[in-house]
Amino acid sequence: MLQQCCQLLEDRLLKVAFIESASSGYLTSQFSIHKNSGADILLGGLVSYDPRIKISVLKVDPKLIETYTAESPQVTEEMCRLGQTLFQQADIVVSC
């Protein structure tokens, strides 16, 4: 699956960035070491495992975390949206 994703991104000249929490940087790591593709497709990633990072770096509203939990779909969606401001050159931002 990783190889297919990397190949599709490379074929379409797309750049990806990751905003990770639960995966703790695993996706960024895997995409970065993919043979001959890492530098061509990966812009970077941010690991925001601790809610304080979500709040201070990504600027997630603390009330959203209080209402839904730091691992909720609502917070994850907001992380993705806010991650687009950090990685403006990314065609795709993935948050998990």
Stretches with model-predicted labels:
Residues 1-96:
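Short alpha-helical segments enriched in small residues
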